[in-house]
Amino acid sequence: MFIAVLFTLWLAASAMAGEFTGPVVGVLAGDTIEVLHKKHPERIRLSGIDCPEKGQPFEEKAKHATSALVIGKEVTVQMHGKDKDRHTLAEVVLSDGTNVSKMLVAGGWCWWYPKYAQQNRELKRLESEARAGKRGLWADPYPVPPWEWQKWRKRP
């Protein structure tokens, strides 16, 4: 019985990690895309970053930047698990090796998300460079990170 439980847990963990390749068929937000996987669109949350939320300044520009980078292109999805909304959390890489999260941070369209990518020093460096260059949302003198913006919106 114990071995059966361990095997089931191992299978579940294996299903959350892994890799697949497919075309990007949709961009739902700056940090959320849909990739065709086994003939069905799978919602993918780009790991390590957080883009402006719906209604937040630069939300549409971040979504457009993501679309320009990935829509219709073949990508490799390196899955890391699920986010709080049960969407697949993953690194997404274009066929030429370009990491989508890194490109969005470098362009100034999102924040490095230290809560979930604290060890990713490259994202931190890319964000610092985008800030210094006032690229994307860093042109705003007081950009508000999505996690702070959500807290502010929830206040009565």
Each predicted region: which residue ranges?
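Small beta-barrel nucleic-acid-binding modules, primarily SNase/OB-fold domains
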Residues: 2-156
